[in-house]
């Protein structure tokens, strides 16, 4: 049976991604000075303005307006004619401390209050919720092909803009990839969509030629392209007005781009701007770590892990797996392996993955999972032998 599946990505200059990067830049700046800082930082951008809000509890000072301007400059919004630039945009801040009602459950979990002696029981989950992790073996990074290629296209768009290969490009852009499957195996790419902001002086024909030559052909495996592959490059014909001038942006509004492109389920919680006591982030990273190690160990060809937590409780209230008919062993056995190999209490996740450090801004564009350009601890295949010994 044949079917099509599509995923999208966006560049670092997309309005929502600007917000994610600002929120994570603030988080990184605080963790660099205060590894135990509590951060929930939200950002909104619109024409000529940035608003940073949230709850931050820390013993250090960070210059948020300076962080905002430096982040916008690094993305590439440096000229007024782009409709948004780092020097002239207004930066507003409204920051308060973390609610003491939340802090009391995070600082000391219910297990600890009831006399638990295990040091990893001390920190309770920062909220309730469910988080999903996914991995499959259709790419070398154990990611679905559509989102993997879409991210690489978006990253390449920024590369050719910043290195001067295509100097007329501007920071905003989006990509989309449709993969055709036969009997659940990726066999070809059916459609590629690239929309990129550009200067008014360049023709659509030139953009199409350059994007195909310098972006698509440099990224997409040629063996997955054929004469029937569809290419849509700036299909509206013009994309001069973009970034926050074209659309307002918010932190946490690209959660499917951030994860598996819709191929795996999502619990609904965003990542950027959140310190690792927030299980929306740390447990989603842990779930990916679990799923990737299990697939790499040969437990299944596709595997999705769900973790669920209650606020103030250290241990997950549930762990479940789905192998989509590809499992080599029973799902109940897989859950047993997870419980034996992985400690999924927030304190243990933070310790094992070394999450109290400034590593987050680099995740805020081009995906949090399956990255080949940066090293991320939840992508480590460091549990393979333990898993194989239990299969």
Curated annotation (Swiss-Prot):
Residues 98-108 are annotated as: Flexible loop. L-methionine binds at residues 55, 98, 247, 278. GO terms for molecular function: ATP binding; magnesium ion binding; methionine adenosyltransferase activity. ATP binds at residues 14, 172-174, 238-239, 247, 253-254, 270, 274. It comes from the Bacteria. Catalyzes the formation of S-adenosylmethionine (AdoMet) from methionine and ATP. The overall synthetic reaction is composed of two sequential steps, AdoMet formation and the subsequent tripolyphosphate hydrolysis which occurs prior to release of AdoMet from the enzyme. This is S-adenosylmethionine synthase. The gene is metK.
């Amino acid at each position: 049976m044949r079917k099509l599946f599509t995923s999208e990505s966006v560049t670092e200059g997309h309005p929502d991604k600007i917000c994610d990067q600002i929120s994570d830049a603030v988080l990184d700046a605080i963790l660099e000075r205060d590894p135990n800082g509590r951060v929930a930082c939200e950002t909104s951008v619109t024409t000529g303005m940035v608003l940073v809000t949230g709850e931050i509890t820390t013993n250090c000072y960070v210059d948020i307006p300076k962080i905002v301007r430096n982040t916008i400059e690094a993305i590439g919004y440096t000229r007024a004619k782009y409709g948004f630039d780092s020097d002239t945009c207004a930066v507003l801040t409204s920051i308060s401390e973390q609610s003491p009602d939340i802090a009391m459950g995070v600082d000391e979990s219910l297990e600890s209050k009831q006399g638990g002696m295990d040091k990893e029981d001390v920190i309770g989950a920062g909220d309730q919720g469910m988080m999903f992790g996914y991995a499959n073996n259709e790419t070398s990074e154990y990611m679905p092909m559509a989102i993997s290629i879409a991210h690489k296209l978006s990253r390449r768009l920024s590369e050719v803009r910043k290195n001067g290969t295509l100097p007329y490009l501007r920071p905003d852009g989006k990509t989309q990839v449709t993969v055709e499957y036969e009997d659940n195996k990726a066999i070809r790419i059916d459609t590629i969509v690239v929309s990129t902001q550009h200067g008014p002086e360049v023709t659509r024909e030139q953009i199409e030629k350059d994007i195909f030559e310098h972006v698509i052909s440099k990224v997409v495996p040629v063996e997955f392209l054929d004469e029937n592959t569809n290419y849509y490059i700036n299909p509206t014909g013009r994309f001069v007005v973009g970034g926050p001038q074209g659309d307002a942006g918010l932190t946490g509004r690209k959660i499917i781009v951030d994860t598996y492109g819709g191929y795996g389920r999502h619990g609904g919680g965003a990542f950027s701007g959140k310190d690792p006591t927030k299980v929306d982030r740390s447990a989603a990273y842990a779930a990916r770590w679990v799923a990737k190690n299990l697939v790499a160990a040969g437990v299944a060809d596709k595997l999705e892990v769900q973790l669920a937590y209650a606020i103030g409780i250290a241990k997950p209230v549930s762990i479940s797996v789905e192998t989509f008919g590809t499992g080599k062993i029973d799902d109940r056995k897989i859950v047993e392996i997870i419980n034996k190999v992985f400690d999924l209490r927030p304190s243990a996740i933070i310790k094992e993955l070394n999450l109290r450090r400034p590593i987050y801004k680099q995740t805020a564009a081009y995906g949090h999972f399956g990255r080949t350009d940066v090293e991320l601890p939840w992508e480590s295949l460091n549990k393979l032998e333990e898993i194989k010994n239990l299969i």
